[in-house]
Amino acid sequence: MYELLLLALLTRKPMHGYLFIRVINDMIGPFAKVSNGRLYPLLTQLEASGMIATVAEEGRQRTFAITEQGRARFHRLMLDTTSNPGDYARLFWLKVPFFEVLAGGERLYLIDHYLNYCQAHLVHLDGELTEMETYALQQRYMTPSQIAATVQAIRHLHNQWHLDYNDVLALRAAEVTRIELVDGATHGESAPTPVERAE
């Protein structure tokens, strides 16, 4: 995640370490924080691998810029949908502000993948709710109060994913319009039907 964010920020302008920390912590906060011990070794690694380069140095403060090799690496990271699947919801929304670097079809690819990702969670949670209904009828393994508390937690998660799904549908509609107006070509396919929220 931090490699993605560092390269993403450098696609906009050169930055120094202190500014990296401030901006990244604003993006991932309020409780998650990137430390100096995590950031500076990563900067060293990226520079050694040719992804970034020092363009200014004042005392102990160095300003970095992204290289062409770094831009290619960033592009691959943006389109990666298989790494860290359990944390992909967070990664997706961190990518959205940097969609400007992608072609229209690539943006829609990420959006459609995330729609399917949300759908998979909704289908899974629907199955969990059905299972809880079976437990309630059979009164096995769990007490009624335990079942009720579990159902409440599942419904909460379901509502969150349903909201995310609808937000991404709106994002997709905006992207299709943007592609039609700005890129001059329509790449949008029919958006999937939203999964209805479980009652």
Where do the protein language model's features map onto the residues?
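Positions in alpha-helical segments
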Residues: 4-8, 94, 109, 152
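Long, low-complexity, intrinsically disordered segments
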Residues: 193-199
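Mid-protein regulatory/catalytic core that forms ligand/cofactor-binding pockets
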Residues: 108-190
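Residues in soluble alpha-helical coiled-coils and helical-bundle/repeat scaffolds
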Residues: 11, 15, 29, 101-102, ...
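Charge-dense, low-complexity intrinsically disordered segments
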Residues: 33, 64, 83, 101, ...
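Basic helix-turn-helix/winged-helix DNA-binding cores
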Residues: 1-91
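Amphipathic alpha-helical dimerization/coiled-coil segments
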Residues: 77-127
